[in-house]
Amino acid sequence: MITDMQLAIFSNVLGVFLFLLVVAYHYINANTGKPSAKAK
């Protein structure tokens, strides 16, 4: 069985990974989109 400590570590690692995935997605999406208004 999974102990409480293993479950806590797993959930924390999963949460950090998903948070970083969302941050990376937004960073990539913001920097590789349509040309900005500054490019005129």
From Swiss-Prot:
Membrane topology: Single-pass type III membrane protein
GO BP annotations listed: protein N-linked glycosylation; protein N-linked glycosylation via asparagine
UniProt keyword annotations, A-Z: Endoplasmic reticulum, Membrane, Signal-anchor, Transmembrane, Transmembrane helix
Pfam families according to UniProt: Ost4 (PF10215)
Lumenal side: 1-7
Top-level taxon in the UniProt lineage: Eukaryota
Cytoplasmic side: 29-40
Transmembrane segments: 8-28
Compartmental location: Endoplasmic reticulum membrane
Broad class of the protein's primary localization: endoplasmic reticulum
Gene Ontology cellular component annotations, sorted alphabetically: oligosaccharyltransferase complex
Entries under InterPro entries matching the protein: Oligosaccaryltransferase, OST4, Ost4p_sf
Subunit structure: Component of the oligosaccharyltransferase (OST) complex.
Role description: Subunit of the oligosaccharyl transferase (OST) complex that catalyzes the initial transfer of a defined glycan (Glc(3)Man(9)GlcNAc(2) in eukaryotes) from the lipid carrier dolichol-pyrophosphate to an asparagine residue within an Asn-X-Ser/Thr consensus motif in nascent polypeptide chains, the first step in protein N-glycosylation. N-glycosylation occurs cotranslationally and the complex associates with the Sec61 complex at the channel-forming translocon complex that mediates protein translocation across the endoplasmic reticulum (ER). All subunits are required for a maximal enzyme activity.
Family: Belongs to the OST4 family.
Protein name: Dolichyl-diphosphooligosaccharide--protein glycosyltransferase subunit 4
